[in-house]
Amino acid sequence: MLVDILRIIFIVGGLTFVFMLVQACWQKRCNGTLESTPFWPVALIGGVANFLDTLGVGSFAVKTACYKQFKLIDDRVLPGTLNGQCVLPTVTQSLIFIGAVAVEPLTLISMMIAAAAGAAWGARHVASFDRQTIRLVMAISLLVVAGLIFAGLLGLFPVGGDAMGLGGYKLAIALLGNFIFGVLMNVGIGLFAPCMTLVYLLGMNPLAAFPIMMGSTAVLSVFSAGTFIRKGAFDAKAVLAVAIFGPIGVVLAAMLVKSMDMEMLKWLVAFIVIYTSWTMYASWRAARRSPVQLAVERAG
């Protein structure tokens, strides 16, 4: 019953987004402001990125790197474009994993609500955040966590478990963590890897992370993308391309995850955490070097 209700919520949210996107694309076309973004390169990048996203590797970092490398998307509309592109893929992810992985209802629903509340609070206070400090702290924290996970896999440290739900102080920690991750999504830090790490460290089955993190992101993305669409701060053609081809990558990856051995999945989690730590550090380093390079260029 609960699974059916959640699926209806996700479907309604997805259809609402589709209506808003089609309406916005039509208006831009009528006004002559529809972007000239190349459709197929963006669609291919979106399909691959969302394949990786379903495995737990956040798609934001992959897509941002590709868009900047090939100069496909204007930086001014990049945040809105990324948020819009993730709606239908995350809705697809949620529809697949909500029913396939039996997470304890209280844990699933409460963590989704916590993430949504964090995103709502963060949207009002995001301007006061120091993104550089957040990136560096997250990079170091995830690196430490990766070390703990590897130690557990090698039998040096007890970590992970088989639980499909949380209670007591562990649930409280999970709710606080997901609230914070929801806040951080407003500064471009994806929820997937931190949520997966938290769930694993609290003793849950790694597979339980998938419906939790995907359900949380699906709820958030519908609201955040709607805001960007209303403001017109997005690339309509790029969003449309990934809205079509992103879910295809999701379905292919979901088939792989479902058939994956649990021990292999634990190793995948560890490598995803290390990768995310590196991308956080790389973003911090790039943003730190930019003002210095600009000063050197001006002096030259």
Label for each model-derived stretch:
Residues 79-87, 210-218, 243-247:
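Transmembrane helix-bundle signature of multi-pass membrane transporters/permeases
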Residues 63-77, 193-208:
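Interfacial segments of multi-pass membrane proteins
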Residues 33-34, 57-66, 88-92, 161-172, ...:
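Hydrophobic, membrane-facing alpha-helical anchors
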Residues 72-75, 228-229, 262:
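Paired intracellular helix-loop junctions of major facilitator superfamily
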Residues 1-49, 98-186, 200-201, 206, ...:
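Juxtamembrane transmembrane-helix boundary motif
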